[in-house]
């Protein structure tokens, strides 16, 4: 029997969905239709049905008492509660967010739910029943529904229901439902907004009329992108942000440069006119780039605050700038001037990424970059994404470019709040921008604005869009611009009259004309094509002594082999480390990983920060590095490089996600913005690096020539043919060599630990100088512990990196040498190992071997001096493990022909042309490799075709 207590009402604390749940449970309790939570069952026994009192305004403004104790009322309350949640979750499906559509962008289950409740039903239910935080003036459920529909189904629409954190979700709904976002703008700000839109529209129309047919990739149709960026930048500045990083493609870029980054109109016009103008600062390299790819850095300010804004240089490869800009931000956020990990302050900088509606779901680099947003090594405290949504990709409609309702749907999987906004509603757009920056600064997470507009012209200004979208472009032709729409609104509201609006327009036009008048005629004084590489680049890296005193190396090694008392190193790892204890003593040998650690430590002691990332970089893919130790009992980590004495620079090493493109882009961006830092990316296997090929092609190899953007990024690409098949053999060195020109980077394939030590230190020494350039290293796998790659302490303490090395104990009888063999990396070690093994007899007096350690720039002077020693030389042979159409051969062939002259033959020994880098049969691989070595070392084989498929030929 129910023991109803009338003195206390526990149901008063339940509202909305929680009350709905309690009512459902009571229904089950009464009917016995299902199990009820024991605690609730006890409450039902004591207090009876959920009931409460509230003042409900009726039609005659009298208060009435409502109790949901009968089944009919329970069902109605549940329907209202569900409807409230559906409006919050699906209101966007009824919202007017597309300026090219007359009403809502689709039908939804909301309509059905609303039709199931009459106005009378809704009036009978108190507002607090379904909306605990209902604002003043909201008395009944009918008021609630009207208010929420007004909030969620107008020109601003929200998708928050996928957000997993309840605190964040509640904050977002509170911000939206409290109406604090849509407070009326002051007349001053509304006038300023109209002036901004007038400037944007006027600029685009001036370009359209003045430079007919020239590509500019107009912003028209999403003009509000500029005020949205303005709002985000200045609100960020008010929060103390020092750097705002922007990444965007070419659409609207010129307007963003001119307005957000304050690039003078006259400078923009000069670029269109191909004229030189006084005061213009070229932000391009020696070959340059088109105007809508160039970036800019500018301190932006108003009466209150200022901040530095950087618009990243950008290729036409859509979205690949995203990770680069994220790297910029992380570099700006970190203090690298202390030992240990860098100290990150995410309030110092943030990123704005402007996406295309076709590219955001279409380009995989987008999801790769989004995946970085919550990772310790890559998070930047939240990025604000803006999709400049013009509903078409070149000529492709949205139904052909994505499989989702919205172009933004990908972001849901990364727990990112989404706001859709009609680009023809300027004040709604600013509200979206304001919500975005507040959320980012509070929660340090990503936020997305889907700015939905249209594209007034074709993909470029020479394109006729009506050919492929005739109906849409009939609408667009007759559709007023957002400036005109907003001007009419301000006139109707009495903010401005027609004359004042016309004055604003005329002022903009006069300014544009005045700035255009400053531009001189096109400069045709130098009609010849002349590309001048800066001398410091053309000269290459000058020889640098990189040895470290032996006592210092020994002290470093001692520190590398120590860890805190009580720290339990994994026994197998402990043995590996302990083997390094005497490596720097007499008769000791230094393996690759130790040479690397010694180089890192010495570089840190000289004040250069280091950042190393890769999929298994803390341990090393081949279990060789062990630069981060794990306690076997607690799983705590420790890196000896964080505790070495005399270090005032940070060291960070991180395991990366399973991504190449985004991570390479990120590290490149980090290095560009932190040029004093030795930034290294390591591929798990070099074979997988080609998934970042766009970054190598567009940024790492060419960024300086195109944009003057210097980088010292180091790429560690494990490479070597060991019978492991076509996906674990080749880092595709031929591709890096094909891209090599104008001393744009260094490509090397080393054969000793000492060489690795010295080239790392050489790279660190040029950071932050005009001589800096990326370093591409084909790193070893089986050679990591190979006896012939080990080095002595004196080889580290003395000397420098050698671009070419001669094989010891060969060439001692110069007049007898007939064949000079050139090779690189593992191939060179295979030749040396065969000689040392003594298994076969070769006439070694007739052979000399040179290891080409630095493939590019090729050490021509060094090799030429070696050739001159051998007066009876008959042939110069290039030997490689890769197929003939891969590896270095096609790069080396013209070099060898030039070195050999008329009297000496040149030739190739190696595998023939193949479509796959390597075979899958380890036994066949071994047989081929042995034959290559035999051909190279035995002059009697002189250009003979053997039964096995090994290519041997001469000129």
UniProtKB/Swiss-Prot annotation:
UniProt xrefs under SMART domains: Transket_pyr (SM00861)
Keyword set, alphabetical order: Glycolysis, Oxidoreductase, Thiamine pyrophosphate
Matches recorded under InterPro entries: 2oxoglutarate_DH_E1, 2oxoglutarate_DH_E1_bac, DH_E1, KGD_C_sf, ODO-1/KGD_C, THDP-binding, Transketolase-like_Pyr-bd
GO biological process: glycolytic process; tricarboxylic acid cycle
GO MF annotations in UniProt: oxoglutarate dehydrogenase (succinyl-transferring) activity; thiamine pyrophosphate binding
Domain of life, source organism: Bacteria
Reactions it catalyzes: N(6)-[(R)-lipoyl]-L-lysyl-[protein] + 2-oxoglutarate + H(+) = N(6)-[(R)-S(8)-succinyldihydrolipoyl]-L-lysyl-[protein] + CO2
SUPFAM superfamilies, alphabetized: Thiamin diphosphate-binding fold (THDP-binding)
Pfam families xref list: E1_dh, OxoGdeHyase_C, Transket_pyr
Cofactor(s) this protein requires: thiamine diphosphate
Listed EC numbers: 1.2.4.2
One GO cellular component term: cytosol
The protein's enzyme class: oxidoreductase
Family stated for the protein in its record: Belongs to the alpha-ketoglutarate dehydrogenase family.
NCBIfam families: 2oxo_dh_E1, PRK09404.1, PRK12270.1
Quaternary structure annotation from Swiss-Prot or TrEMBL: Homodimer. Part of the 2-oxoglutarate dehydrogenase (OGDH) complex composed of E1 (2-oxoglutarate dehydrogenase), E2 (dihydrolipoamide succinyltransferase) and E3 (dihydrolipoamide dehydrogenase); the complex contains multiple copies of the three enzymatic components (E1, E2 and E3).
Job of this protein: E1 component of the 2-oxoglutarate dehydrogenase (OGDH) complex which catalyzes the decarboxylation of 2-oxoglutarate, the first step in the conversion of 2-oxoglutarate to succinyl-CoA and CO(2).
Full protein name: 2-oxoglutarate dehydrogenase E1 component
Taxonomic lineage from the root: Bacteria, Bacillati, Bacillota, Bacilli, Bacillales
